[in-house]
């Protein structure tokens, strides 16, 4: 299909997943399978000492993958802002909490991060998959099974047995050394269905940052209630955009695709998408772009811009304060730059302090 002499890729669900898997395997050859995909996410990091959020230079498509070696499960964000992709291991010490459309988590390095999802349903589905994976680790800790084929490293990592992870998540139904407990064998029986339904199939033009309409009913995990101020307004997506498996790097940097014009009109306020993050009473909108990397050149004409593909991306804003389980309050006093400045100014106003400085300088010069 072509429009204005430009070639538009026409990929179905399987072709898109295969292409995404090929790109991921260039980064990590041990990746075997993509379990689920989120079309667009933005990352924030939480400073525990200052109790405030700051924007990380990470945004793009999120992929939860299964690997053929340790660690068995990871999630990867193909970063559109720079060449550094974000990779996190899904191990037993991974903690998370959902406050849609945010997923807050603490990793093995004790860093507290927040993931903002464009699609709140994808946030819930990713959280459900995280829960299935982490529950497998907790099951192994409660019911350890001896396996002569496991290495010492695997024993220390306290991961689920190979049959638990490989059996239900693999396309093949056969597995070696399958445990006797049927609950282990069927533990991830619906994981692939979750990944597949979240990636609805459609033939037609495909764009890398299109956030699709998905007809299936999402899984509903047990999550914390969403924050009222963080509820995004509903934005209708154009009907032709249906695939939620975004096409990654091969098309994201193509200026021909990025600069295409169309019939989608957006009436948006002037964005502050790339300024320092701040708390807002209600979310703002930014113009719909294929790969959001810069504000519009002429903000006054932003409402007149026309794009052929993609939908307006909601203005991300700092997530809510993480719960004490993820970010405990600091126990000691916080020393900030302003407090140091105030202390020095108060010392300079004391004559005794000035006399001590003067005597010290005189003694140093005499020596």
UniProtKB/Swiss-Prot annotation:
InterPro entries the UniProt entry points to: Dcp1 (IPR010334), PH-like_dom_sf (IPR011993)
Keyword field: Cytoplasm, Hydrolase, mRNA processing
CDD domains for this protein: EVH1-like_Dcp1 (cd13182)
SUPFAM superfamilies: PH domain-like (SSF50729)
Chief location: cytoplasm
Name of the featured protein: mRNA-decapping enzyme-like protein
Function, in words: As a component of the decapping complex, involved in the degradation of mRNAs. Essential for postembryonic development.
Compositional bias ranges of the Pro residues kind: 315-331
GO cellular component terms listed in the entry, alphabetical order: cytoplasm; extracellular region; P-body
Annotated source species: Arabidopsis thaliana (Mouse-ear cress)
Compositionally biased intervals (Polar residues): 196-211, 299-309
EC code: 3.-.-.-
Tissues where this protein is expressed: Expressed in seedlings, mostly in root tips, root hairs, and the vascular system. Also present in roots, leaves, stems, and flowers.
Family statement: Belongs to the DCP1 family.
Assembly notes: Homodimer. Component of the decapping complex. Interacts with DCP2 and DCP5. Interacts with BCHA1.
GO biological process, one term: deadenylation-independent decapping of nuclear-transcribed mRNA
């Amino acid at each position: 299909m072509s429009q204005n002499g430009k070639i538009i890729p026409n990929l179905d669900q399987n072709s898109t997943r295969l292409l995404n898997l090929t790109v991921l395997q260039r980064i990590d050859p041990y990746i075997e399978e993509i379990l689920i995909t989120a079309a667009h996410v933005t990352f924030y990091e939480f400073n525990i000492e200052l109790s405030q959020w700051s924007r990380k230079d990470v945004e793009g498509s999120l992929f939860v993958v299964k690997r053929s070696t340790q660690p068995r499960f990871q999630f990867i964000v193909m970063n559109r802002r720079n060449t550094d992709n974000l990779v996190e291991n899904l191990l037993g010490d991974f903690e998370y909490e959902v406050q849609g459309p945010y997923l807050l988590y603490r990793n093995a390095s004790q860093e507290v991060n927040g993931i903002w999802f464009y699609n709140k349903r994808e946030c819930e589905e990713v959280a459900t998959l995280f829960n299935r994976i982490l529950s497998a680790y907790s099951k192994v800790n409660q019911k350890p099974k001896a396996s002569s084929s496991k290495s010492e490293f695997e024993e220390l990592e306290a991961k689920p047995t190979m049959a638990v992870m490989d059996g239900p998540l693999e396309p093949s139904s056969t597995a070696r050394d399958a445990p006797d407990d049927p609950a282990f064998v069927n533990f991830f029986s619906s994981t692939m269905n979750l990944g597949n339904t979240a990636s609805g199939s459609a033939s037609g033009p495909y764009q890398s940052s299109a956030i699709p309409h998905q007809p299936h009913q999402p899984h509903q995990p047990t999550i914390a209630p969403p924050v009222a101020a963080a509820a995004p307004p509903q934005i209708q997506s154009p009907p032709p955009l249906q695939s939620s498996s975004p096409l990654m790097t091969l098309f994201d940097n193509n200026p021909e695709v990025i600069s295409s014009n169309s019939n989608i009109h957006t009436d948006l306020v002037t964005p502050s998408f790339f300024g320092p993050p701040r708390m807002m009473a209600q979310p703002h909108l930014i113009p719909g772009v294929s790969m959001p990397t810069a504000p519009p050149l002429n903000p006054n004409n932003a409402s007149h811009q026309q794009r052929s593909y993609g939908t307006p991306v909601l203005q991300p804003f700092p997530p809510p304060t993480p719960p004490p389980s993820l970010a405990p309050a600091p126990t000691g006093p916080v020393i900030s730059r302003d407090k140091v400045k105030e202390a020095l100014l108060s010392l300079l106003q004391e004559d005794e302090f000035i006399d001590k400085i003067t005597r010290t300088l005189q003694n140093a010069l005499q020596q």
